[in-house]
Amino acid sequence: MAERGYSFSLTTFSPSGKLVQIEYALAAVAAGAPSVGIKATNGVVLATEKKQKSILYDEQSAHKVEPITKHIGMVYSGMGPDYRVLVRRARKLAQQYYLVYQEPIPTAQLVQRVASVMQEYTQSGGVRPFGVSLLIAGWDEGRPYLFQSDPSGAYFAWKATAMGKNYVNGKTFLEKRYNEDLELEDAIHTAILTLKESFEGQMTEDNIEVGICNEAGFKRLTPAEVKDYLAAIA
């Protein structure tokens, strides 16, 4: 009860030392569609559940797995409109870096800059935190990278992780299945199986999205490619 008076103020700490609006933003992430990221020896895979709104909906009109540069891509759990703002901001930050240094932005640099944007929205008046967590995959300096960034602006490097609805089940499954020698092909299968752990209904190429990042760059798999992977694990 004592914290209720602080729940609408973003810039005021509650007596227990929390910024309650950030707690609410994390709750929005935990209620969002599940997403999974796995770093393999030769690449990174991102996978997410894509809810079908209606049979009349054009599935290709909006994507959850988005490329930021040729070698970096990301996915989210949480609020879609907030994510699209961050996608645009991330692309702009990457372009600004290229204009200054004449080389592609390293993955860790982009994560740091996007996380700084998210952190700004936790201490400014008249705004609210972003209701999304991001998984950012990249390839540079001959190796893969996987990061997660939260509404608070905190970011961490991961070998494999899950977020969104039932993320605890996803992480438990990954802890059992993950090993350091995982190849990209196996990682794709593992990511889909992780999503399947908490998936409701029939999993098809229309209601999941998969992106991969390796030496060749980042790409979103086509529905036909996803269908082949689903057939392989059936």
UniProtKB/Swiss-Prot annotation:
Cellular component terms per the entry's GO annotation: cytoplasm; nucleus; proteasome core complex; proteasome core complex, alpha-subunit complex
Sequence positions bearing N-acetylalanine: 2
InterPro entries reported for this sequence: Ntn_hydrolases_N, Proteasome_alpha, Proteasome_alpha-type, Proteasome_asu_N, Proteasome_sua/b
Locations listed in the record: Cytoplasm; Nucleus
Gene Ontology BP term (one): proteasome-mediated ubiquitin-dependent protein catabolic process
Keywords for the protein's UniProt record, in alphabetical order: Acetylation, Cytoplasm, Nucleus, Phosphoprotein, Proteasome
Residue numbers carrying Phosphotyrosine: 121
Highest taxon above the source species: Eukaryota
Main location (coarse class): cytoplasm
One protein family per Pfam: Proteasome
SUPFAM superfamilies in UniProt: N-terminal nucleophile aminohydrolases (Ntn hydrolases)
The UniProt record lists the keyword Phosphoprotein: yes
Cited NCBIfam families: PRK03996.1
Cited function: Component of the 20S core proteasome complex involved in the proteolytic degradation of most intracellular proteins. This complex plays numerous essential roles within the cell by associating with different regulatory particles. Associated with two 19S regulatory particles, forms the 26S proteasome and thus participates in the ATP-dependent degradation of ubiquitinated proteins.
Family label: Belongs to the peptidase T1A family.
PANTHER family per the UniProt record, alphabetical: PROTEASOME SUBUNIT ALPHA/BETA
Subunit: The 26S proteasome consists of a 20S proteasome core and two 19S regulatory subunits. The 20S proteasome core is a barrel-shaped complex made of 28 subunits that are arranged in four stacked rings. The two outer rings are each formed by seven alpha subunits, and the two inner rings are formed by seven beta subunits. The proteolytic activity is exerted by three beta-subunits PSMB5, PSMB6 and PSMB7.
Protein name (database record): Proteasome subunit alpha type-2
UniProt lineage: Eukaryota, Metazoa, Chordata, Craniata, Vertebrata
Gene name of the encoded protein: psma2
